[in-house]
Design a protein with these regions (language model features):
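Basic, nucleic-acid-interacting segments
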Residues: 2-241
Length: 241
């Protein structure tokens, strides 16, 4: 089958809403994150979120100040985002909520994956007819905005090559991952030593299921339909919060 002939975009190229996506060769997938109602992913702390703001944080909650410094990775190079962040001269204050301990403070090695979170991820994989990997291995993604005390987000690939059944037909699912959520930002203030960002550690480490679909959406309407299908599928799992 011959490739379709693409014409030049019709309309004002300075106004994105005036252009038809198919004329631009637009095609995308979606990435959906779903928080799980379990304990934290790499510590045995409870998955609790506290209803506090920067003005209502209890005085007895400890605070720790840190600075993240860029370091060379295994390949010998410094990540470009980490290099940029180190030049911003920012410091970070972490408020230790009752459900955060040494692991959340990056003072203790992480524990194995929460078994209930893994079970839910495998259940969702089965709903998507995805193929589980033979071995769960935890990877580290560089996080340089201070929302993770370790400077990394821990992510595990659970399954691949799935399919989401929607009202308009099947949608390919490239990967399903299990990863930890970030800390919640409470405030950003300016000091004589640079910008200071304050985070609450209650959310840090909560399990997230990440679902990434294949790039099969030619327009925003299809994206919304695929998202709605993913949302309904996740809503059928009672352990998704």
């Amino acid at each position: 089958m011959a490739d379709p002939i693409r014409t030049e975009p019709i309309g004002d190229v300075e106004d994105a809403s005036a252009l038809e996506p198919f004329q631009l060769g637009f095609m995308c997938g979606i990435e959906v994150h779903q928080q799980l109602a379990t304990g934290k992913l790499h510590s045995r702390q409870p998955g609790v979120l506290y209803d506090v703001t920067i003005d209502t944080v209890p005085e007895q909650w400890n605070r720790y100040q840190r600075r993240l410094r860029a370091a060379r990775g295994e390949g010998g190079a410094i990540d470009i985002a980490a290099r940029f962040e180190s030049r911003r001269n920012r410091s970070f204050v972490y408020v230790q909520s009752p459900n955060s301990g040494l692991i959340e403070l990056d003072e203790q090695p992480p524990l194995p994956l929460d078994k209930q979170a893994v079970s839910i991820a495998l259940t969702v994989s089965a709903l998507l007819e995805a193929k589980p990997v033979s071995l769960l291995q935890t990877m580290r993604k560089t996080v340089v905005d201070g929302s993770n005390t370790s400077g990394f987000q821990r992510t595990s690939l659970v399954s691949t090559d799935g399919v989401l059944q929607t009202e308009t037909g099947p949608v390919g699912v490239d990967v399903l991952c299990l990863e930890e959520d970030s800390a919640r930002k409470l405030d950003t203030i300016s000091t004589g030593n640079g910008e200071q960002v304050i985070y609450n550690l209650d959310r840090l480490g909560l399990p997230l299921i990440e679902i990434a679909t294949a790039p099969g959406c030619p327009d925003s309407r299809t994206c919304k339909r695929n998202f709605d299908g993913t949302r309904k599928m996740l809503a059928s799992n009672p352990s998704s919060s």
